Design a protein with these regions (language model features):
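Non-catalytic DNA-binding core/recognition domains of DNA-processing enzymes
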Residues: 13-95, 255-258, 282
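Residues within the helices of the helix-turn-helix
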Residues: 22, 163, 275
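Flexible interdomain linker/hinge and immediately adjacent N-terminus
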Residues: 85-133
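Basic, Lys/Arg- and aromatic-enriched nucleic-acid-binding interface segment
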Residues: 119-162
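A short, glycine-centered helix-capping/turn motif at helix boundaries
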Residues: 145, 150-173, 267-271, 281-282
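Conserved tyrosine-mediated DNA breakage-rejoining catalytic core shared by Y-recombinases
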Residues: 163-206
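Active-site/catalytic core of tyrosine-dependent DNA strand-transfer enzymes
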Residues: 203-260, 265
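C-terminal catalytic core of tyrosine-transesterase DNA break-rejoin enzymes
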Residues: 255-284
Length: 294
């Protein structure tokens, strides 16, 4: 780890001791990349406080969701109210879109229907079955692409956040700490709201479970999904794989969750259904309501 990354990590831990590990890593990565992209030669943490105006100008081109996270990281690190004020403006803008049930420009440009999502899944399933029956053409990368679409599209199970599956293990796991698959069930200890909801489990439908079991026999690693260097997948890697699976569209996990909930809650069903699905997707009922778009 570089000296700057180490200092960022320690300072954020000091300022937010209860911040989850995933959020900590995200904040450090964002802050380090802003510093790198702006080509600063000043490697002191004070740089983030001394150059507020220039940094705000640099990051303003990000989409609202990314900008909100970036500003949150900057505020947690520095405590500068300028970052917080802009962050609150962005959050208000995002919430207004949700209230009006409108899509952002990026979402509108890349939005696809639930039926189109299912078409992609079934095309992926057909290709995976073909690879299994013809071992000579088997590609681990393509099979991982199929599994990711199955896990995250909503065509098979309610779609959780990408890193819930990036952390998913199939062997040598600690059942009290790790996310893991066992005997047709998914167990989640690591996810964004784990401190609130604790361990969550999800049953895997039998047909998809069969595909998982066949994959585990071929998988040489401890993780359900892995990169070309046999390490667990990162969020950016998962995003790139999804973009490929959906024909080059900018389809993120967040958008797939929006598409799924927009379909499920099209006519706003009973709150009990909202509560149940929110739990299965690893977030709060309030956030589920915010996701609804038409």
């Amino acid at each position: 780890m570089s000296s700057l990354k180490q200092e960022l990590t320690e300072k954020i831990k000091e300022n937010r001791p209860k911040l989850g590990l995933s959020s900590l890593k995200t904040y450090v990565s964002i802050l380090f990349n802003v510093h790198k992209a702006m080509e600063s030669e000043d490697n002191k943490l004070e740089w983030y406080s001394d150059n507020v105006k220039d940094i705000l100008e640099f990051v303003k081109g990000k989409n609202n969701q990314s900008l909100k996270t970036c500003l949150s990281a900057l505020f947690v690190l520095t405590g500068k109210q300028e970052y917080r004020e802009v962050m609150m403006q962005v959050m208000q803008s995002v919430n207004e879109l949700y209230k009006q049930q409108k899509k952002s420009p990026t979402q509108a440009e890349n939005w696809i229907s639930e039926a189109e999502v299912k078409d992609v899944y079934f095309a992926q399933l057909e290709n995976a079955l073909h690879m299994l029956s013809t071992k000579k053409i088997f590609s681990a990368n393509k099979y991982i692409e199929f599994l990711l679409v199955g896990f995250l599209s909503g065509a098979v199970i309610p779609p959780r956040r990408s890193m819930d599956y990036g952390e998913l293990m199939i062997r040598n796991y600690d059942p009290k700490v790790d996310n893991y698959y066992k005997a047709g069930k998914l167990y989640f200890n690591k996810y964004k709201t784990a401190k609130t909801y604790g361990l969550q489990t999800l049953d895997v439908p039998a047909p998809f479970n069969l595909m998982i079991k066949r994959w585990i026999k071929l998988n040489p690693t401890d993780y359900m999904l892995f990169s070309t260097n046999k390490q667990k997948l990162s969020s950016p890697q998962i995003s790139r794989i999804l973009n490929t699976a959906f024909g080059g569209k900018n389809i993120s996990t967040n958008m797939l969750r929006h598409i799924y909930l927009s379909s499920v809650y099209a006519n706003i069903p009973a709150l009990s259904s909202i509560d149940r699905l929110a739990t299965e997707m690893g977030h709060s009922p309030a956030q589920a309501m915010e996701y609804i778009k038409h």
